[in-house]
Amino acid sequence: MGLPSRQPRLWLLLLVVLGWPQPCLTLDLIPYTPRITSWDLEGKVTATTFSLEQPRCVLDRHSSAADTVWLVVAFSNASRVFQNPQTLAEIPASPRLLTDGHYMTLPLTMDQLPCEDPADGSGRAPVLRVGNDAGCLADLHQPRYCNAPLPGPGPYRVKFLLTNSRGSPQAETRWSDLIALRQGKSPGSIDTWPGRRSGDMIIITSILSSLAGLLLLAFLAASSVRFSSLWWPEEAPEQLRIGSFMGKRYMTHHIPPSEAATLPVGCEPGLERFPSLSP
């Protein structure tokens, strides 16, 4: 007779237990999607790193001074099965990426993410550079939450997770879109056939080739003029020797044979006759 009266109480207790909010399941989903920074920067995405915009003014309403903002990095196929850690000991470090496909890094306090204009005149872009700590690979005793370079092109997905001082999650953002890193090409895979080039590229190449030919011709002409003096040296003007006589130009006069025959013996043209000293 007493059993039917206890059964409704058991059902009521079960409903209360199931309906009681669990701390691990009451996460606030923040309508924010992490993305690559929109700042005009070189190398926003490289072969081992990528730069995210900082989540400023995103987690302020859900956090306290003792909370920590974590970045969760996962392969795209592992992001669907990622389970938020419940304690600090369960937070996965960077080596777990190669085994479990995800890890957490870049712990930040709310003081490091001020809600203000990022263009503060310091000249530094407010970004979070994932995979920027190259020293992690060389340090055998690397920090637990080291920001090591990413091992492959991905693709990756990231999200921000807010935890309290005990490591219990409080809020999280959406997962980002796919982030693929850059990949280098082997020299043999690069097609150098001119037919693959665009028309503008062919015109520019032709103009540069013509200019190079003109410069070469100008160089050869200048070189030939410069070294011609070495091949054919100029003749130096004849120098006068010491003791040489330099006088006015003398014009000779032609004397007809008839006049030369009438001159007395012993006389020459233009000379007076001298008396003979012979007896």
Swiss-Prot record:
Superkingdom of this protein's organism: Eukaryota
Topological domains, Cytoplasmic: 222-279
Membrane topology label: Single-pass type I membrane protein
CDD domains, A to Z: UP_IIIb (cd09969)
Tissue specificity note: Expression is urothelium-specific.
Record's subcellular location: Cell membrane
Key words, A-Z: Cell membrane, Glycoprotein, Membrane, Signal, Transmembrane, Transmembrane helix
Ranges in the topological domain labelled Lumenal: 27-200
Glycan attachment sites: 77
GO cellular component, one term: plasma membrane
Record-annotated membrane-spanning stretches: 201-221
InterPro entries linked to this entry: Uroplakin-3 (IPR024831)
Signal peptide: 1-26
Subunit structure: Heterodimer with uroplakin-1B (UPK1B).
Family to which the UniProt record says this protein belongs: Belongs to the uroplakin-3 family.
Function: Component of the asymmetric unit membrane (AUM); a highly specialized biomembrane elaborated by terminally differentiated urothelial cells. May play an important role in AUM-cytoskeleton interaction in terminally differentiated urothelial cells. It also contributes to the formation of urothelial glycocalyx which may play an important role in preventing bacterial adherence.
Name of this chain's protein: Uroplakin-3b
